[in-house]
């Protein structure tokens, strides 16, 4: 059975080839006028410069962590930490970095091409931007499959590890590098993009009264660079980590659940099927000229829903062939993941799209000023957690019992029963099911920043108003699809985090003869819960204040240029775009390290003081509060953004009105919500889990309590 894992290579090759074909297709389109090409080159140059400095900084941190892991692994003779983990940490980080880099390269080559295509038709603009997003989506899933398959064959055949439990426990540790890189990319990119966005909007729109992406705004280029480093490179690393993490967590649970190599093969096979279904669905994304937002949403839904339905149909024979009769219960769990993912996507769309009542009512709140629209957005975000949490709760319960879980959790020796582990395997495979069609889901997400950049280039290049109207329609759709993509990532993170938590407990129990109390009656578990809950809020505070400080420097700089460079407002002098790009780069690199290190230091210190039971409490606390906070922030931010777009479309006074200025203030509050703190939380949840698993041996050996 284990020899069938070569299908992972097949999935990687298919995804890679499709990504290359889509990239060639995009590069075949015209990049527009000379001015459009120069603007695109400036954005590309700024994005490349930032990523070069970010990766240089991150690699230094990676080197330090690698040495620490290496010392622990070899000094303990592999007892505290597998000798493979330090090297898997490096490869996971490199693949995650590469996923973001490839996505950003194609995005910065597609923005002007999308603007030029939009000058011809709305459908052509949609196709170019979506094809660019497809490169990102299929690169992520292809690299993920390649990484997992290479490590499986190395461990199984090169090093002769034939025990599924041992192999699964080693493999689950491999996700730490990807999670670590993803957190740096998301936090750093999020700080950059939102500092530029907030600074550009507050001074440009509110104070100077000039349109979005106006060439007179010194922060315009930095804003467009930020779309790429945060919403493309950061998101690519983020979802690569989510994809790989969900599969690896299921690997570990398959072994202890008694499914062996067959249970490990299932998530791989499901991922390959998802790649093929995503390719089919991508060909169905198209629209008519002058399409409404509802019609544009329908075009993307057609592709994503078709892929999900095909994956659901093909998953049934996979489950039966690999797991026999037990496969039918696992199939129900996969359906829970697929349906849950689509349901989260729908309700995210409902709360954030301006075609629905919640965002329209939020836009109406601008009639009474910025305070009421901010209050309304917070209320909307808080309310939106209800549906997401209920969907995930239902998916957890149904998948657990369908896969063979029971109410009896532990046996007489205090270890988890096989039935409990089978149920947890069901929850893990539900997470894989939710992300199985990530190729097309991520394509619809990565398309958004490209459309946003295209609108900026159209404005700065002085293209006709009808072109800007088309790019605005695509941009507004992108805001909704971005929120939907974040919903998928957050939902899958909650399922994966639960699977990783149980993997941690299993690994701890396998390495100690002590009977540990992991229930709420343990004071260390309770204290850990409080620390985990606190970590969510402190981490969010770190990322929000980082954006605040970086945005303040941009606001001061833009005001200075308007004041000290005569002729900017009359188009007689060019702003100093490079200075704003430099400030954003410095701010993001300086501010991203502290939040990222929290995810490593807090679980490790908690474990060394409170022991393994305290870590379980921490993981439970950060998972629950982090999930709810991430949904709240992402949906509130998306709604504020689209409420502003709704007003710019001619409602409630339109562009330049007092209502519009109030909506811009709401949007600037929502920017770090939806693009920095919110999406970073789902990485925090999983990184805490993988860090705890990696350092479980050290914690067992040296804890105080």
Model-derived segments and their meaning:
Residues 1-705:
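Hydrophobic packing and interface segments
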């Amino acid at each position: 059975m284990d020899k069938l894992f070569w299908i992972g290579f097949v999935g990687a090759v298919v995804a890679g080839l499709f990504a290359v074909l889509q990239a060639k297709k995009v590069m075949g389109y015209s990049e527009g006028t000379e001015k459009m090409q120069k603007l695109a080159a400036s954005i590309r140059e700024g994005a490349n410069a930032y990523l070069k400095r970010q990766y240089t900084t991150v690699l230094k941190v990676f080197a330090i962590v690698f040495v620490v892991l290496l010392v622990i692994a070899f000094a303990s003779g592999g007892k505290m930490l597998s000798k493979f983990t330090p090297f898997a940490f490096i490869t996971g980080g490199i693949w995650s970095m590469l996923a973001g880099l490839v996505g950003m390269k194609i995005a910065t080559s597609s923005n002007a091409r999308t603007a030029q295509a939009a000058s011809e038709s709305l459908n052509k603009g949609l196709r170019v931007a979506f094809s660019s997003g497809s490169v990102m989506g299929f690169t992520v899933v292809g690299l993920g499959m390649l990484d997992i398959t290479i490590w499986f064959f190395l461990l199984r055949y090169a090093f002769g590890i034939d025990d599924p439990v041992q192999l699964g426990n080693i493999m689950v540790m491999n996700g730490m590098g990807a999670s670590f890189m993803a957190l740096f990319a998301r936090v750093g990119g999020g700080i950059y993009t939102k500092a530029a966005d907030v600074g550009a909007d507050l001074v440009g729109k509110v104070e100077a009264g000039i349109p979005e992406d106006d060439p007179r705004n010194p922060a315009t280029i930095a804003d467009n660079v930020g779309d790429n480093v945060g919403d493309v490179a950061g998101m690519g690393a983020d979802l690569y980590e989510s994809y790989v993490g969900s599969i690896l967590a299921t690997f570990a649970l398959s072994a202890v659940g008694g499914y062996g190599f067959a249970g490990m093969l299932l998530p791989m096979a499901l991922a390959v099927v998802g790649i093929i279904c995503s390719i089919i669905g991508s060909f169905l994304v198209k629209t008519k000229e002058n399409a409404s937002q509802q019609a544009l949403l329908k075009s993307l839904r057609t592709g994503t829903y078709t892929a999900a339905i095909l994956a659901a149909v093909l998953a049934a024979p996979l489950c039966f062939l690999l797991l026999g009769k037990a496969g039918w219960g696992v199939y129900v769990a996969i359906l829970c993941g697929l349906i849950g993912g689509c349901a989260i996507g729908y309700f995210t769309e409902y709360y954030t799209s301006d075609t629905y009542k919640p965002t329209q009512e939020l836009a109406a709140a601008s009639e009474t000023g910025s305070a009421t629209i901010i209050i309304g957005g917070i209320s909307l975000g808080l309310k939106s957690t209800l549906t997401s949490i209920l969907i995930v709760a239902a998916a957890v319960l149904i998948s657990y019992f369908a896969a063979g879980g029971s109410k009896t959790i532990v046996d007489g020796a205090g270890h988890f029963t096989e039935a409990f582990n089978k149920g947890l395997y069901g929850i893990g495979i539900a997470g894989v099911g939710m992300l199985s069609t990530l190729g097309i889901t991520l394509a619809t997400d990565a398309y958004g920043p490209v459309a946003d950049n295209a609108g900026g280039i159209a404005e700065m290049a002085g293209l006709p108003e009808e072109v800007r109207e088309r790019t605005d329609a695509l941009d507004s759709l992108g805001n909704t699809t971005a929120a939907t993509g974040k919903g998928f990532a957050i939902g899958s993170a909650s399922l994966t985090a639960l699977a990783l938590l149980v993997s941690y407990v299993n690994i701890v129990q396998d390495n100690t003869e002590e009977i540990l109390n992991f229930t709420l009656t343990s004071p260390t578990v309770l204290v850990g819960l409080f620390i985990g809950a606190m970590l969510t809020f402190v981490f969010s505070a770190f990322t929000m204040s980082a954006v605040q400080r970086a945005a303040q420097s941009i606001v001061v700089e833009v005001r200075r240029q308007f004041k000290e460079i005569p002729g900017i407002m009359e188009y007689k002098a060019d702003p100093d775009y490079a200075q704003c790009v430099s400030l954003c780069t410095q701010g993001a690199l300086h501010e991203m390290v502290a939040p990222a290190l929290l995810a490593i230091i807090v679980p490790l210190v908690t474990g060394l003081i409170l022991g393994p039971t305290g870590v379980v409490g921490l993981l439970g606390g950060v998972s629950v509060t982090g999930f709810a906070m991430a949904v709240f922030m992402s949906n509130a931010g998306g709604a504020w953004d689209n409420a502003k777009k709704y007003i710019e479309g001619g409602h409630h006074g339109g562009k330049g009105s007092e209502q519009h200025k109030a909506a811009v203030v709401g949007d600037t509050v929502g920017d770090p919500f939806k693009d920095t703190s919110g999406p970073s939380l789902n990485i925090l949840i999983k990184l805490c889990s993988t860090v705890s698993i990696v350092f479980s041996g050290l914690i067992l050996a040296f804890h105080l309590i």
